[in-house]
């Protein structure tokens, strides 16, 4: 196999697991109202149920690094997608049966392996990006957006066909399991022997040390800012639009446009990175996202919500993926640093919704959007830390 063909296959396999991970997540979110009705949950209880997915992810991330180091990405990918697929099938049956306890357990068991797969995908994505002459990482993340869009539209069609949650989740689970496990066979089967006490202590020290590195902390702040912008949009943009007169359908359509812009930005973002470099691209993304949020915040007065959403989505599209590549510059520390930033992502997924909700309750949701806007302006000022490291 030629090197060019090898990189192409590697890129396709890594992109595939981003797509399937998004497909599962989107399939669950898109049928949220039916899940809520089947389990007889009020809004607060549904919010708690939804938090179990990222909560399971945080648990999974605590041992994702050692798992990959010991067994390699290929075997870990196979095991985690098998668990996630089986749990997703069980989740559908539990929801239709109205069994809240089982639904909670299965949702936790979906979130846990999905976070490990998130780690695997970013490790492989960073590696294939470094092996290529062109910047590929934003395009790999773009397949996550494609998965979100496919999942949402597929769910809409299946609902119109009166497909039960059990049947839908079973079909999605089987498809995701087969495609993802097959894709993982393109990954290198690299494993390390059982660690000695000395090497285990050294690995723990390395993992802990990245949380005290100035560069890693600053990049994590930038990554957190972009994820806060994404999470706050997913949770609050449709609600904010309905507050200013949009129908639920119109708000959903606007949010769909937002995700289309993000996906296109990620698929094409590599060309921008190749032209301007990582640091300038992150600087531009931070400023563009902040300007989009500010335009959206002014929406009730200037009536340009779509302009705000397009700028918001376009700027946000490449920002977070590039912070991961910045964490992966040094192969020796890539695993620990990428684990760090993904942990920040899952922590933000749990905290951002309630935090902005509290501010929104007190001051209005449009005012609350000022928090991610301010953080993105700070991120623009910090963007210099994302310059490529010179590895000695």
Predicted regions and their residues:
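Hydrophobic core of transmembrane alpha-helices in multi-pass small-molecule transporters
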Residues: 19, 99-117, 304-317
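C-terminal ends and interior cores of transmembrane alpha-helices
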Residues: 82-97, 288-300
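Extracytoplasmic gate region of multi-pass secondary transporters
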Residues: 28-29, 214-256, 260, 264
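Interfacial helix-cap and linker-helix signal at transmembrane-aqueous boundaries
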Residues: 35-36, 67-68, 157-162, 241-242, ...
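Symmetry-related core transmembrane helices of the 12-TM Major Facilitator Superfamily/SLC fold
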Residues: 167-185, 369-384
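Pair of pore-lining "gating" transmembrane helices in MFS-fold secondary transporters
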Residues: 4-31, 108, 213-229, 310
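C-terminal transmembrane helical hairpin of 12-TM major facilitator-type secondary transporters
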Residues: 276-323
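Intracellular juxtamembrane helix-capping segments at the cytosolic ends
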Residues: 115-130, 317-331
């Amino acid at each position: 196999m030629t090197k060019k063909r090898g990189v192409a296959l590697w890129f396709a396999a890594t992109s595939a697991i981003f797509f399937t991970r998004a497909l599962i997540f989107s399939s669950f979110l898109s049928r949220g109202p039916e899940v809520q009705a089947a389990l007889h949950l009020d809004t607060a209880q549904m919010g708690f149920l939804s938090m179990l997915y990222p909560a399971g992810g945080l648990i999974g991330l605590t041992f994702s690094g050692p798992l990959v180091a010991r067994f390699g990405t290929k075997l870990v990918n196979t095991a985690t997608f098998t668990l996630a697929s089986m749990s997703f099938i069980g989740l559908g049956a539990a929801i239709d049966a109205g069994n809240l306890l089982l639904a909670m357990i299965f949702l936790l068991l979906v979130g846990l392996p999905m976070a490990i797969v998130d780690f695997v995908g970013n490790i492989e994505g960073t590696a294939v990006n470094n092996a290529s002459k062109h910047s590929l990482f934003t395009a790999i993340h773009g397949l996550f957006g494609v998965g979100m869009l496919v999942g949402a539209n597929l769910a809409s069609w299946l609902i119109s066909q009166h497909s039960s949650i059990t049947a839908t989740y079973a079909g999605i689970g089987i498809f995701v399991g087969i495609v993802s496990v097959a894709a993982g066979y393109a990954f290198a089967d690299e494993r390390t022997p059982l660690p000695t006490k000395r090497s285990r202590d050294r690995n723990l020290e390395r993992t802990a040390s990245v949380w005290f590195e100035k560069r890693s902390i600053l990049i994590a702040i930038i990554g957190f800012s972009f994820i806060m912008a994404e999470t706050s949009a997913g949770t609050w943009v449709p609600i904010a639009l309905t507050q200013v007169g949009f129908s639920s359908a119109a708000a959903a359509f606007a949010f769909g446009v937002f995700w289309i812009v993000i996906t296109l930005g990620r698929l094409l973002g590599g060309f921008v990175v190749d032209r301007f470099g990582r640091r300038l691209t992150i600087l531009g993304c931070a400023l563009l996202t902040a300007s989009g949020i500010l335009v959206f915040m002014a929406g009730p007065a200037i009536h340009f919500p779509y302009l705000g959403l397009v700028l918001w989505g376009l700027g946000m599209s490449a920002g977070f993926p590039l912070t991961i590549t910045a964490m992966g510059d040094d192969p020796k520390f890539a695993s620990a640093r990428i684990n760090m930033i993904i942990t920040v992502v899952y922590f933000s997924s749990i905290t951002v919704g309630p935090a902005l909700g509290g501010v929104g309750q007190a001051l209005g949701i449009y005012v609350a959007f000022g928090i991610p806007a301010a953080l993105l302006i700070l991120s623009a000022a910090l963007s210099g830390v994302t310059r490529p490291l010179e590895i000695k």
